[in-house]
Amino acid sequence: MDYKDLLFCPLDLPTPPVIDYSKFKVWYNEQLDFNKKHNVTALLADGKQEYPWEVSWALWWNTYDKPNPWICNFEKTFPELVEYFKLYPFKQFKSISFLDQKESRDVYLHTDPDNRWGMRFYLFNGLGEKLYFVKSKERLTTRLRTMVDNKYTDLWEHSQKEKLYAKFPEKRCAWMLNSLDAFHGIEKNPSPMGNRVTCVLNGDYDYKKLFELLERSVKKYKQYSIVY
């Protein structure tokens, strides 16, 4: 298949390591001050009441090329996650973040900056199948940004107006998404924070490994895949 058509698919990778949420929150609070001082994205997100997540960064664009790129000893606190990251098809990680969906909040329709193929996994997921996609009205060559000049782009009006819900082989798993030819959102989280935490991995791809992973994944999880 043409992998440009692939909008969503679970990935043929092991189940992510299990970690303790309270331990994660301790690290979250430690990295908060660092990122507020050094991470422009964190500053922009800080204090936004409408922002549906609490975001933390294990590695960011201004740390990835340092001798030790990990923020606030992430690699010592969660070595099992650092090893898990290595299974993804990147030559160089440039940003690794965690999105902790706020209680009683849905996630509005949006796109992500990794464009064509985005790598994700659920660190925690108590919501089940709440992630949905809508196809773009027509095939796009550039991503429709969620916000332009502090104004929300009504992505629904640029879509085919049909919600396609992602299904997963297990609650906690690795998966990919396409933010060029589809937009996505998440239904409301009725439970306390920590019920749904997504890891977002960005960087420079090893395309040979990427396409090998996509080929294995589509073959294994064809019944779960969403295509344009």
What is each stretch, according to the model?
Residues 24-28, 35, 74, 78-81, ...:
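Extended hydrophobic/Leu-rich segments
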Residues 8-9, 46, 61, 133, ...:
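Generic detector of low-complexity/intrinsically disordered segments
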Residues 1-90:
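Non-heme Fe(II)/2-oxoglutarate
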Residues 1, 14-20, 66-67, 86-95, ...:
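Generic structural signal for short, solvent-exposed loop/turn connectors between secondary structure elements
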Residues 5-7, 115-119, 193-197:
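Residues at beta-strand starts and edge strands
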